[in-house]
């Protein structure tokens, strides 16, 4: 349960915590070519804990015999493009040895939930309690008997707040900036508008609410962070369903040999990543031809324009389902029942609205 730096001095990328369970139904994220039933041999609940999901992912890795094809404990430190190919510098961390390689294509699949965004609030430096980002949250039992402030209004804020409540926090106050999550919270959990400042051990909110605090947990999101890429290759975006400058959400508009995977905010996860990977594979192999810049711009603008009009979770689910469906149809990825996934996602969202404490008890 390491936080901070790993054994090599690099930031720990892991944002998981001890009692983490899937917050979305497994039926919506299953690999099309490797089912949960195939892996476990028996049906399992729709919302498995992290250890079960990890075991499932490892099973798919073993089935594909992938480990022998990966150089582990290597840190890519620099990527540049010389007009023909990519020059990559990497560090073998185990042997502390640098090497340089040349590649025709680069795929960036580093994720974007590892480098925390940490806002500043007046009074943070003099706050006598504990302040941490949800990235470093590991065990809710640490907050038993404490007054906890959680800042944020997305999945991390939701789950961290409920974890602290379940494991005995004295109170949990969730501060949101724009819109509240609006669930029917249990007694001891409440949402208030936007932290203004900390005064001693007291949190002062912009709606006038005041709350004694022992700990402040910043569930304030993450940064797309690519320190190894030269500036002309970096995707610069916030967390959104369709990042700009990516054709089909994958191909870098300014250099078609640079491919990004998994850079979107996500309802679909494993199946979307797979559809992106199949699409990227076919681009590299020349099976999919990239159109001219005018067509690329038109396609990107179409998706970005649709994204900007989304108003609620059901519309967002529809948007990402249609995006993943389009990618799927461009390759030979195995069949996916997108309409069933769409239906399950919407039921899941409605179950959360009905009872945020019990939605994981449902089966799909």
Set out the residue ranges of the language-model regions:
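C-terminal, flexible cofactor-proximal segment of oxidoreductases
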Residues: 257-364
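Glycine-rich dinucleotide-binding loop and its adjacent helix/turn
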Residues: 36-39, 49, 53, 99, ...
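Feature captures the FAD/FMN-dependent oxidoreductase FAD-binding
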Residues: 42-110, 114
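A conserved short coil-to-beta-strand element within the FAD-binding core of flavoproteins
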Residues: 72-87, 137, 177-202
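Glycine/threonine-rich phosphate-binding loop and adjacent beta-strand/alpha-helix elements that clamp
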Residues: 7, 16, 224-288
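Core beta-strand elements of the Rossmann-like FAD/NAD(P) dinucleotide-binding domain
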Residues: 94-105, 144, 206-215
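Short glycine-/small-residue-rich Rossmann-like dinucleotide-binding loops
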Residues: 92, 111-112, 136, 217, ...
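Glycine-rich active-site loop/strand segments that organize a redox cofactor
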Residues: 1-59, 247-253, 290, 296-317, ...
